[in-house]
């Protein structure tokens, strides 16, 4: 089955589309990558989205407009991916949408909201669309994240030692072989917020880690940041830009006088490296396989490698899965599992009471024709 996975992460800079030919073969799920592409949000939509994200206030009218506009942007990306990556022969779209809010209190998640109305995708492509993946796990008592953990478990199963998957997006999350999975804290969220806020909006992120490379870590600020209570919470746990946003950063800077943008970003980059390395040590990993936009920041990767010491650090590209679109591939897998009636969660990873078949399905132009329910769940993901 040719599936297009669509994903826009907490950095909300672009829509990643990854196409894969997926099939079950015995106890294996075989994934043949067909290609990937990225479609940047237009500046107006990105600004509208940024203005609506926590801690800012928004309106129901604003949410409705964003749901439609993001859905139309995802639809355009899906049409292009079908044409350029699948030769017009895609059979399913799996859309994560754009997370705008994750409702968590006292370690429990009560709700989550991803925008990007899937009806626009179904209308534009004519294909069935699986979307709204996270709420089913939350209803079962889980965190609704990290959902890529099941894919990580299937993919890294059988590797020597203790291999953990690490995603460095806006938020960092990891998955260990025993199913333990959680958000470690910010990966690029605070770095991006600082780059944007301290450059007067000229920059969206620290390009190639250039600002961090010119800066010096401000130890008092780092100590204040490391005192954040989230880091001490037990797994499973999840977080997002509801906590780690520009206002949070401004509070952290209070009382330190004027710091250069370079020093602030160097400090935030070190914060990510330290908190990720602490999480890796907590699960006694011997290897870290990293993916996500943060892998393109050489300063962050160098700091992280230094903190990890003897623990090997490599990117998912080295194992055959492009780090730039690993999450999009993961949601293609989750969509495939859903239409085959298979669970897309591991309760150990999310804290749910039981595994769940994820998402809601929007029929395509020819109605809803699902494949036969699979008789068993795969235990390994194999790349071809």
UniProtKB/Swiss-Prot annotation:
One of its GO terms (molecular function) is kinase activity. Pathway: Amino-sugar metabolism; 1,6-anhydro-N-acetylmuramate degradation; Cell wall biogenesis; peptidoglycan recycling. The lineage of its organism: Bacteria, Bacillati, Actinomycetota, Actinomycetes, Kitasatosporales. Belongs to the anhydro-N-acetylmuramic acid kinase family. Keywords: ATP-binding, Carbohydrate metabolism, Kinase, Nucleotide-binding, Transferase. Its EC number is 2.7.1.170. ATP binds at residues 9-16. It catalyses: 1,6-anhydro-N-acetyl-beta-muramate + ATP + H2O = N-acetyl-D-muramate 6-phosphate + ADP + H(+). This is Anhydro-N-acetylmuramic acid kinase. The keyword Kinase applies. It holds the Pfam family AnmK. It comes from Streptomyces avermitilis (strain ATCC 31267 / DSM 46492 / JCM 5070 / NBRC 14893 / NCIMB 12804 / NRRL 8165 / MA-4680). Catalyzes the specific phosphorylation of 1,6-anhydro-N-acetylmuramic acid (anhMurNAc) with the simultaneous cleavage of the 1,6-anhydro ring, generating MurNAc-6-P. Is required for the utilization of anhMurNAc either imported from the medium or derived from its own cell wall murein, and thus plays a role in cell wall recycling. It is an enzyme of class 2 (transferase). PANTHER family: ANHYDRO-N-ACETYLMURAMIC ACID KINASE. GO terms for biological process: 1,6-anhydro-N-acetyl-beta-muramic acid catabolic process; amino sugar metabolic process; peptidoglycan turnover. It comes from the Bacteria. HAMAP family: AnhMurNAc_kinase. Transmembrane segments: none annotated. The keyword Chaperone does not apply.
